[in-house]
Design a protein with these regions (language model features):
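NAD(P)-dependent Rossmann-like dehydrogenase/reductase catalytic/cofactor-binding core
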Residues: 21-114
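Anionic-ligand binding region
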Residues: 1-26
Length: 114
């Protein structure tokens, strides 16, 4: 969701670009680390299942956050990256990808108000 907004990317980009899917996966792995610290068991197979789901989506499909970006609407980034960062701090897990995504999205949202 967040990566698609920052990249302006439809599902096709994640289906075809190793760089885009790698960035998405890096954000997901931060969530997995936090989940494990909280006693929630997420595994590599969960990421594999996400890729299987993603591969079946329409290449022209867009995440809700990308649609928000295109309409210059405030996003739900605080519910995504903001919460990941908060929980990362709680469990002493670094979240550099989600931190970067939050900063970029908040900066873009600020720019829309100018």
């Amino acid at each position: 969701n967040q990566v698609s907004a920052v990249l302006g990317a439809t599902y096709a980009v994640f289906q075809k670009s190793k760089e885009a899917s790698g960035l998405m996966e890096a954000a997901m792995r931060e969530v997995m680390s936090i989940a494990r610290a909280a006693g929630i068991h997420l595994y590599d197979k969960d990421i594999d299942e996400w890729y299987a789901f993603l591969s079946k989506q329409s290449p022209e499909g867009k995440t809700s956050m990308l649609q928000d970006f295109e309409a210059k609407r405030k996003t739900e980034v605080e519910m995504f990256a903001g919460k990941v960062i908060e929980l990362g701090e709680k469990y002493k897990i670094q979240t550099p990808v989600n931190d970067m995504l939050l900063k970029i999205i908040k900066a873009i949202e600020y720019k829309w108000q100018m």
